[in-house]
């Protein structure tokens, strides 16, 4: 009942309701209630309050919930500022996912290219893959310029996730590392497209 009332206030309440929700968030120790209030903040466009929770909440679960909501709200600038200041790798992964939710391919590309932590680079590359083949040229560019085999493997998987047959064929034709070439061919064998099948037949006939 309480969470239903919280959702109602977020959808239909005025300034007094917003203030009541803020006071409830500050006074409650119930994580589920706080999550419901954060959701209401998001629905009613109270970005500053969601941002305050994302930055200052002691509960990592609530921080991650607020960060996700910032992604839904399209708060790319605020998320990027948080990412640069955040020491926790796990929280940074949540920020990257929120950037993905908000369609922030530009910042994800920046992380995929230049982040020093390999796990965060891989997370950014994965998100770029899930965003569809419009990020294919970026992924190919990173693949061509980065000699790290693990990063290249992550890019191959991202290209597979987005169904980018052309990019995988290009890599399978030109890659000199036999393991990576084999991996590209393996991805193509699971894609079920005519173009991929034709390429695999071509390989068999060589």
PLM region descriptions:
Residues 149-192:
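Ankyrin-repeat and related helical/solenoid repeat scaffolds used for protein-protein interactions
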Residues 8-11, 24, 40, 69, ...:
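Core register positions within helices of long alpha-helical scaffolds
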Residues 94-98, 107, 112, 117-143, ...:
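Eukaryotic tandem repeat interaction scaffolds
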Residues 14-27, 44-56, 73-85, 102-114, ...:
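Amphipathic alpha-helical scaffolding segments comprising HEAT/armadillo-like alpha-solenoid repeats
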Residues 15, 30-32, 59-61, 88-90, ...:
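Alpha-helix N-cap/helix-start positions at coil->helix boundaries
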């Amino acid at each position: 009942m309480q969470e239903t009332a919280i959702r109602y206030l977020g959808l239909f309440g005025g300034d007094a309701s917003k203030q009541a929700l803020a006071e409830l968030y500050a006074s409650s120790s119930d994580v589920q209630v706080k999550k419901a209030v954060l959701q209401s903040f998001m629905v009613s466009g109270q970005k500053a309050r969601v941002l305050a929770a994302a930055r200052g909440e002691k509960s990592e679960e609530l921080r991650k919930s607020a960060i996700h909501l910032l992604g839904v709200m399209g708060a790319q600038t605020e998320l990027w500022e948080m990412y640069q200041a955040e020491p926790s790798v796990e929280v940074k992964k949540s920020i990257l996912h929120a950037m993905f939710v908000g369609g922030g391919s530009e910042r994800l590309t920046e992380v995929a290219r230049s982040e020093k932590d390999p796990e965060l680079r891989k997370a950014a590359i994965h998100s770029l893959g899930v965003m569809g083949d419009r990020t294919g040229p970026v992924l190919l560019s990173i693949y061509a310029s980065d000699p790290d085999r693990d990063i290249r493997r992550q890019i191959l998987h991202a290209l597979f996730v987005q169904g980018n047959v052309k990019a995988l064929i290009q890599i399978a034709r030109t890659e000199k590392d036999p393991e990576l070439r084999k991996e590209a061919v393996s991805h193509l064998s699971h894609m079920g497209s005519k173009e991929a099948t034709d390429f695999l037949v071509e390989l068999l006939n060589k």
